[in-house]
């Protein structure tokens, strides 16, 4: 069979030719992009359909046939060959973009998903200290222990863990679960991760709620000023303030930052409109019609079990009010400077 094996391998791996000025290389780069593109490709469309089905997104539908039938490889004197879409697929292109961004922000970065990931990492840090017979008194010691446990050499040669004598070789998820069980299932992080009964409760549960809650503080700030205040909210000083106000320990407060990495079309997708090739960004009225801006935000979780409160909702409002007071106090100090 007459097959261009080099092009086939490049299409699978996504390895494009560096010199796009050569017509043949430019055309083959467009072929590669169809299978292994940055924004929309064969695998990506398959994943989008799967995610819509598995995630139960009732607010998104895609006409895949319309999108595929609209694909062309076009040529212009400036950039050579490129993948373009017929204008009739504009709606499908925006839907694909919105699904990926929606999934990232509201599924991958959901407050429960992030908390579960945090607990797993913390559990594995203590587990690593135990199996490697290392101290676990400080955060740095625990971080270093986990890095040592997850060293890539374990994928090459067997590694005997000094404390438990467990042989770690080509580790999988099951190995790390076994290591946690061998350590201490009563460890606060391990216990929560296994049981899925989390002690910590989020003070807000979405990006929209976060900005709504702090609107009185944020509304008059520039983007740069907002980022400064966001840094203060993430700071140890803010956590210490809450510990003092509500008689908490630092371990009772978890703060997890979210830095949205939204997919932007910008100039990277081209639309064929009346025989003219236009960047999608020139035709799109709203590049973030579902998810909004890329400003960072955070989730803050409190262990209400140690507070012993009956009305959790009212107490959440009280804590948020104190956080606002702290932020405004910090703002005034900065303005006075």
What are the roles of these predicted feature ranges?
Residues 1-337:
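Histidine-centered, transition-metal-coordinating active-site segments
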